[in-house]
Amino acid sequence: MIRDLSKMYPQTRHPAPHQPAQPFKFTISESCDRIKEEFQFLQAQYHSLKLECEKLASEKTEMQRHYVMYYEMSYGLNIEMHKQAEIVKRLNAICAQVIPFLSQEHQQQVVQAVERAKQVTMAELNAIIGQQLQAQHLSHGHGLPVPLTPHPSGLQPPAIPPIGSSAGLLALSSALGGQSHLPIKDEKKHHDNDHQRDRDSIKSSSVSPSASFRGAEKHRNSADYSSESKKQKTEEKEIAARYDSDGEKSDDNLVVDVSNEDPSSPRGSPAHSPRENGLDKTRLLKKDAPISPASIASSSSTPSSKSKELSLNEKSTTPVSKSNTPTPRTDAPTPGSNSTPGLRPVPGKPPGVDPLASSLRTPMAVPCPYPTPFGIVPHAGMNGELTSPGAAYAGLHNISPQMSAAAAAAAAAAAYGRSPVVGFDPHHHMRVPAIPPNLTGIPGGKPAYSFHVSADGQMQPVPFPPDALIGPGIPRHARQINTLNHGEVVCAVTISNPTRHVYTGGKGCVKVWDISHPGNKSPVSQLDCLNRDNYIRSCRLLPDGRTLIVGGEASTLSIWDLAAPTPRIKAELTSSAPACYALAISPDSKVCFSCCSDGNIAVWDLHNQTLVRQFQGHTDGASCIDISNDGTKLWTGGLDNTVRSWDLREGRQLQQHDFTSQIFSLGYCPTGEWLAVGMENSNVEVLHVTKPDKYQLHLHESCVLSLKFAHCGKWFVSTGKDNLLNAWRTPYGASIFQSKESSSVLSCDISVDDKYIVTGSGDKKATVYEVIY
């Protein structure tokens, strides 16, 4: 047995005297001495390893301290950014309300100044950040290239820093902070396998930092860090919950909250600047947009058996959605609360701006050339806010790589074995689920809301022209000037020409309002028609303003003589369909078209009051209709997911467009070859009537219930179950203005002079807006 001990000790380690002619003798004392030497050797090795492990533990503790400090600073910056965004939003809301009270020439100057304030170029941003870095470099008093370095001498105390110190932190955290979620997964994976060995090896009270700092270290003390990771996750969840609650409150309270304000008080709709085809990315982090209290109220205030937006027991009676609940939209924010004005470099813009422009400049909005996952954190513009801490925290590190500090940060990260990343986003696949991932945003890194769809189905974000929101005939915003308390859900509205009377259709009657005197709170007359329990679905005035045609959830159409001393029904048209969903009048006032619940389009001779023809083609209810200005072509949309055009001279179908969603509304541009379609899936699509090209617009969050073109043809409005009124530029859909009401907006109309908009909503009222140019 003792002889076998010689096999334990390689001769290369402890050579012994050896004579080839004599046998090898091994005594017990020599073996003990050899064992003692080996023990001392192992003890020395153990001591050396222990020192190295203690050194590593010390480094880990130091790095963990740095990590926590960066996290606290990032959180502080996030809070500061949120605060500044809120300040900017409120200031811009004040500006939007004050500007209309200025004289016309001053209005133009102020509006131009505000617009200039939004045009921040990359050169200006680089100069501003360079000044901040230089000031910070001088204040720290050391010569290192990055103001916040891993060396303790360059670290500020773990407190919330002022906004001025953000640049250095952003630069370095773009490399360190972006991967904050990776160590947690890595440590959990190794935790079970290494726990037993780690427990018997080095016992240290230090807390483990990021697991990827030393890739060659196989046996790490992960037990302590695992608990720290759980604690870290818990803190992040608490922060997220706090931010989500704030965001939802802001959505309800800081937009245009009709329920919390005097209905008669004029208010400007949020005057954002959607020149750039981008929108807030924070909303996109949520998979299912929660139903706000306002939408719940709107649903509860709308009779489920009658309203256009809810399902009925019989699908043939009322056009309905395939689903009673609004489709969750994550690719479109709540307009009015999350659409952010874009910053686009303007060629030739001088670096200096006037004091008003500089005071209105939106902070922390850095355009980034990367596509969506590497975009900037969405700043809150005139009516935007940060609603998701996840997006805000991740986006906090995504500063433009053109800044020199980012390169230094990458070098600092490389010293710790990390790849120099720019704003790694662990949830980038969740950002824009409804928009193909191969689509990049416009310059600025924000996902677009307007897309051009080519003939082969390729979607590309639309670059808006410089005159998208300026020029004759393009409104700046709309101001609510009157509320007409109808008393029932208002499913139909129309405005007289000239603009004096508004007709609102509810349950069993049409009420007539004189809006030339805003003080009038009562209708001037009430036209009882259909049955008392049946909803009016459409009412149309003949061009002379003397005749009103009313249709709804009944088989008859009522023709009213408004020129009589007392308005009276002069005729009724009876069809075989149980309901009429929409009406259109020919330009010569001789023919009326009605969309029937059985899918047919009935053509009525108004002079002889007879049915002269039926267009058959829709396999489900025909829900919406419009007619070309020359009276030769008719467009209809249906619940069979199709839009069809009809030749009125030949009485035949011309075209058919198939969609994947039910069609709830449409409008034909009075001056051009464009047809806008509002759908159940919350999209608005603008089709060219002779070419396969089209535009797809994403700002609504639920069904698009009504749509109307301005008579100039340069813009149109759409309303939806998401309580929103959106105004769009024809045809590419730049968002001109948005207004949020307190309930679903079921119907709308625009006056002939394009100066007034009227909407009918689920909270039993109609709202009159003045369009401000």
Curated annotation (Swiss-Prot):
Residues 317-328 have a biased composition (Polar residues). Residues 137-204 are annotated as: GP domain. Pfam families: TLE_N, WD40. The modification N6-acetyllysine is found at K237, K281. Residues 275-452 are annotated as: SP domain. Phosphorylated. PAX5 binding increases phosphorylation. Ubiquitinated by XIAP/BIRC4. GO terms for molecular function: chromatin binding; DNA-binding transcription factor binding; transcription corepressor activity. In all tissues examined, mostly in brain, and muscle. Homooligomer and heterooligomer with other family members. Interacts with PAX5. Interacts with LEF1, TCF7, TCF7L1 and TCF7L2. Interacts with ZNF703; TLE4 may mediate ZNF703 transcriptional repression. Interacts with SIX3 and SIX6. Interacts with PAX2. Interacts with TLE1. WD repeat Groucho/TLE family members are characterized by 5 regions, a glutamine-rich Q domain, a glycine/proline-rich GP domain, a central CcN domain, containing a nuclear localization signal, and a serine/proline-rich SP domain. The most highly conserved are the N-terminal Q domain and the C-terminal WD-repeat domain. This is Transducin-like enhancer protein 4. It comes from Homo sapiens. The gene is TLE4.
